[in-house]
Swiss-Prot record:
Nucleolar protein that is involved in ribosomal RNA (rRNA) processing. Also plays a role in primary cilia resorption, and cell cycle progression in neurogenesis and neocortex development. Part of the small subunit (SSU) processome, first precursor of the small eukaryotic ribosomal subunit. GO terms for biological process: cilium disassembly; ribosomal small subunit assembly; ribosomal small subunit biogenesis; ribosome biogenesis; rRNA processing. Pfam families: RRM_Rrp7, RRP7. PANTHER family: RIBOSOMAL RNA PROCESSING PROTEIN 7-RELATED (PTHR13191), RIBOSOMAL RNA-PROCESSING PROTEIN 7 HOMOLOG A-RELATED (PTHR13191:SF0). One of its GO terms (molecular function) is RNA binding. This is Ribosomal RNA-processing protein 7 homolog A. The gene is RRP7A.
Length: 280
């Protein structure tokens, strides 16, 4: 019985890889030294008829089981032999078909959760998807020409990437605030035009406006706000926080009382000498 199983396993070809229904399996290895293969499960991205999708149909490859060490650059290099690529994006979970695609900020975005991810690979031509589905492996993620950083080298690189460029950060913040101010101005102008105008049913929309105007986003106004906050923090600072500070403050207070007492005694002696002492 055991001999039959061994013969059957020997006759089975290596390319027969179990995969989920509708997916093709692509074996990959981290490097040449690794013996075991990891499998990417791919299929052509498709949605139901009449449903909008942020990814182009017939040119998008959906990838499952992407390991943490496989970056967008690595996945792009692995699939570059299938045809010219337009974009590669890795995500924590698949996109909803009807969810709007938001622009990704370079600095303000949630930290990705470490673990396996899904990928969307967009080719310039539909033939790239067909070539990727027929791709044979194993493919190497880390090579001598394109090494993948691991260990302390990866930690150093991640730390360096976590420090933003001040000028690029300022440009992105200014761009966002300009777009936000423009949006608010358009909404206020539209509300002002519709003020007092009845709708189809004869109702008049009443909007509340604050008495205090919005502070302008100028450098002088920002400096005034910062100075006001600094003075407020100074007033709220803890006094006599430590025990030795409390003892010193009590000693200084007693010294001031003694000094005032001596000054009062001298003044009383002086008034007695001048015979103008009036205790009541």
């Amino acid at each position: 019985m055991v001999a039959r199983r061994r013969k059957r396993a020997a006759r089975d070809p290596e390319d027969r890889i179990p995969s989920p229904l509708g997916y093709a399996a692509i074996p990959i290895k981290f490097s040449e030294k690794q013996q075991a293969s990891h499998y990417l499960y791919v299929r052509a991205h498709s949605v139901r008829q009449g449903t909008k999708s942020t990814w182009p149909q017939k040119r998008t490859l959906f990838v499952l089981n992407v390991p943490p060490y496989c970056t967008e650059e690595s996945l792009s290099r692995l699939l570059s032999s299938c045809g010219p690529l337009q974009s590669v994006e890795l995500q924590e979970k698949p996109d909803l078909a009807d969810s709007p695609k938001e622009s990704r900020s370079k600095f303000f975005h949630p930290k990705p959760v470490p673990g396996f991810r899904v990928g969307y690979v967009v080719f310039q031509k539909p033939s790239g998807v067909s070539a990727a589905l027929a791709l044979q492996g194993p493919l190497l993620v880390s090579t001598e020409s394109h090494p993948v950083k691991t260990g302390i080298h990866k930690w150093i690189s991640d730390y360096a990437d976590s420090v933003p460029d001040p000028e690029a950060l300022r440009v992105e913040v200014d761009t966002f605030m300009e777009a936000y101010d423009q949006k608010i101005a358009e909404e206020e102008a539209k509300a002002k035009e519709e003020e007092g105008v009845p709708d189809e049913e004869g109702w008049v929309k009443v909007t509340r406006r604050g008495r205090r105007p919005v502070l302008p986003r100028t450098e002088a106004a920002s400096l005034r706000v910062l100075e006001r906050e600094r003075r407020k923090r100074t007033r709220k600072e803890l006094l006599n926080f430590y025990a030795w500070q409390h003892r010193e403050s009590k000693m200084e207070h007693l010294a001031q009382l003694r000094k005032k007492f001596e000054e009062d005694k001298q003044r009383i002696e002086l008034l007695r000498a001048q015979r103008k002492f009036r205790p009541y």
